[in-house]
């Protein structure tokens, strides 16, 4: 993962739950061939924006209001964000379980109160994960953001908790 993430904003409102992100009808709970995640991708966010998967430009950033990711624990609700092509989610507030699940797969999800008022759909933003700043390129407005913990960053930069454990195992046994 890059230290500076830049991308086009796709914006959603408050209370985007895991049923909206990954509709239950698309989840078979067990397909190991990857077809399940593709099915989830085709229906992600369709309750609010039918055909949303066709709109997303790879490398984009999702911005949302309060309570992003609330609801049931679904691995697909986090993995589908990567499958759609997002590099980052930023919301006014994020459900703790959703954020932890995202970190576990190496996907950054940031809580930035007020972000939904700062950017609009289609804006381009830069998020500097070294200096912990966020800039809206439309008007150059820049704000400081709360850094993630060292362990969260380590997990994300490793590509997820499993990859971090593999790295740690190799270091311990070589």
Can you annotate each of these PLM segments?
Residues 4, 61, 149-151:
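Short hydrophobic "helix-edge" motifs at membrane interfaces and signal-peptide entry regions
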Residues 1-29, 163-173:
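N-terminal, positively charged, Ser/Thr/Ala/Gly-biased leader segments
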């Amino acid at each position: 993962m890059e230290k500076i993430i830049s991308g086009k904003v796709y914006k959603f409102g408050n209370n985007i739950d895991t049923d909206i992100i990954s509709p239950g009808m698309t989840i078979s709970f067990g397909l190991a061939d990857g077809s399940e995640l593709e099915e989830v991708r085709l229906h992600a966010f369709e309750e609010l924006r039918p055909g949303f998967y066709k709109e997303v430009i790879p490398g984009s950033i999702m911005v949302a209001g309060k309570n992003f990711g609330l609801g049931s624990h679904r691995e697909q609700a986090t993995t589908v964000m990567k499958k759609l092509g997002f590099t980052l989610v930023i919301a006014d507030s994020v459900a703790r379980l959703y954020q932890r699940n995202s970190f576990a797969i190496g996907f950054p999800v940031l809580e930035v109160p007020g972000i939904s008022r700062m950017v609009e759909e289609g804006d381009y933003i830069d998020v500097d994960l070294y200096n912990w700043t966020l800039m809206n390129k439309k008007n150059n407005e820049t704000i400081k953001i709360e850094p993630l913990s060292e362990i969260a960053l380590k997990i994300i930069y490793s590509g997820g908790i499993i990859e971090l454990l593999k790295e740690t195992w190799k270091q311990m046994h070589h």
